[in-house]
Amino acid sequence: MYKGDCLQVMDYLISKNIKVDAIITDPPYAITNFSWDQIIPFNEMWDKLLKLIKDDGAIVLFGNEPFSSNLRRSNEKLYRYDWKWLKTQVTGFQNAKFQPLRCYEDIMVFSKVGAVSSCKKPMCYYPQGLVNINLKVMRSSVDY
């Protein structure tokens, strides 16, 4: 596990010809005027991520709208699915007079391999720590 500026850490790992199973990062969303909160150019980011990730690895990125939609569109070919992180503390108090507080964050998963059983070599997924919420899951009443 590495902690640091992701572009610098990725450059270091690439220079050592290291390939990794997973990349989990929380890039800046450009939702404030702080100097550190500037979107990393997507082309540069994807170039580095793809040099580092193993062919069957997962790239997991955090975000909020509208950044999340832009991030998904930046690499639709490798986008697989989202998780929603329900936070224990809401955020966005500085904008509370203008919009609802945010209680969740998007977690977007990208991979070079597919995420469905019909793929030649689908991504591995081993759920852990699942909590039974006792809800009946019903099928949609509309057939597509």
Where do the language-model regions lie?
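Core catalytic lobe of class I
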Residues: 1-144
